[in-house]
Amino acid sequence: MKKIYLLITVGFTALSMNSCKKFLEQPSVTKYDSQNIFETVDRAEMVVVGCYSQIFNRELYYQLGMGTDECMSTESTSNSKNQVGNYVYTPSISPSSTFTAMYAGIEYANVAIKGLQGMSVSDAQKPKLNMLLGEAYAIRAMNYLNLIRFFGDVPYSTEPVGETGQFSSSRVNRDVIYDGCIKDLQTAAGLLPWKSAGMVPTYERFTKQAALGILARVALYAAGYSLRWDLNTYSAASVKIAQRPDASRIKELYKIAADACKQVMDKGENSLLPNFETVFRNLITSKYDNESMLLFGQWGQDNNDSQVGYTNGIFAHASCIYGKSQPAMAVTPTYWYDFAAGDLRRDVTICNYGINADNGRDMNTYSSNTIGKFRVNWGPNTGTAVNKRDIDWPILRYSDILLMYAEALNEYNNAPTGEARAALEQVRTRGFGGDASKIGVTPSDYQGFRNAIINERKFEFGFESLRRTDLERWGILYETLTKTKQNLNEMAGVTGAYANIDRYRVYKRTIATSFQDAVVAVPYTGYKTLTPADSTTMAKAGNVVLRMHNASILNSQGTLAPNNALISNLFRGLEREKVEILPIATSIIDVNPGLKGQQHPKY
């Protein structure tokens, strides 16, 4: 009898053609004889579907999604999530859930790949077997990407631990891992069907276009900057931000990224929805669309642990009709003003109100705006529970294909081509409601276009857990966050670029009455100055007069004043050529002898 592997079995739920009813229930962990589980394609499919439970977790958008020019923590400075979100790392508090989850998924994928490769099936079953094998390759590669994004060089294995008997593994050069991931994703793309083939029932599983999109993402990271050190000496003096040393391979990687995106674009199965708002209303109400290309499924009591919409949503009072939503993440105040006038993405991405106990919409002040993309009042109901809202996580959207394509062409050619400009403009025009006259002039030089991409990704993917490591792969994390903190002080003091911002906003309070709420933002009139008499008159007329630098009455993060605690605590651990990569948690090193002496050299 062959070795016993730890596998995951999965039960399927019914699928709806127009609704994203979840394709999996919570897996139950069971021991199976590997010979028996891979006897039939249907049994093997359970193993592959089980891999998806370990491709994402809350840490990826929570601790590791904060600390950017978009997002900050709302928790106390003594809280480990706040510390990680502000670059106050130590090996004792370094996030470990992502590390262990990604390796669990890799082990499941390795088991699946080995088992599937050993199967003999009929010609009629071969396409499905290929699809399953492609999924396993893609999952393994994506999990390694998430490990490298945050931990740099990590242990690397493509064989099941149960097969090799190796429970000790050292760090492997990330360039070797990236090249392995690219090979895996190229293999996956060759095996997987397009969504239109009808074989993949949901965007919560890999299709050919999803594999190509993740291939492009991996290639851009592999070509980009990262914090590196000498893996022979682990000398602190060797730590530096750099690209991989082989310039020809870097150029090849940009071509790989561009070509992968072009395949998706040329196929024509995916497209931008006309309205940015619809993307997230569909997500929250579990509807499929052609823009969402890969989602992490959340449904029911057992497979719903990411707390999307609860940890990273708007504030909703426990007594309101929507049930409690208690965000532990807030909007970096300057982000609001980063958006250009007329960019409709701002009010979808940033919610300017919370829901009080009486269901009233109370406007937020600058310090307390919340994440709007996953707001609970847009859902069809409360969901499974207030902290299990049944909201999928968006891993890949078509707009990312367009922006990665534009970026890769600019890097490959050292200047934007016409195709690169057109791809960027397609995303930007949608952001302005389809009005191309509002998007401004697209730069035609390399650096100007690169800066445009850096900004556009901020506007398009706010709070989708891409910004932090995007800034790192561009080599500008420290510089961007240092500038953000300077801007925040100017905003607090109403000086410099923020000299003419609103000090007051006046609005009418309205009452929410149902789920699938049509409201996007509370309308207001902004004022630079208001006399006490004017304020009194407006209040008597039924308006609320809000001092924008004061604390909010809901989800308060305190006042916004120059150099106060809100500002001084933000990014307080930031240190160039140190915090771009996290230390590996002590608890992980303790159980892996291969990592002894291989901690991040500056920790």
Q: Where do the model's predicted regions map?
A:
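Acidic, serine/threonine/proline-rich low-complexity intrinsically disordered regions
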Residues: T158-V161, R171, S226-K255, W393-R397, ...
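TPR/Sel1-like alpha-solenoid repeat signature
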Residues: Y137, L212-V218
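Bacterial Sec-dependent N-terminal signal peptides
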Residues: K3-Y5, T13-T40, C181, A216, ...
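Conserved, well-structured interaction surfaces
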Residues: E39-V49, S53-N57, N79-F151, G165-P201, ...
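Elongated scaffold/linker segments in the mid-to-C-terminal portions of large proteins
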Residues: N36, V41-D42, V48, Y52, ...
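Short, surface-exposed recognition loops and adjoining beta-strand edges that mediate ligand/DNA contacts
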Residues: Y61-T74, P193-A210, G224-I314, G434-A452, ...
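Short coil/turn linking the two alpha-helices of tandem helical-hairpin repeats
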Residues: I148-F150, P155, S196, V218-D230, ...
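Short edge-strand/loop segments of extracellular domains
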Residues: M72, P160-T164, K262, A422-G433
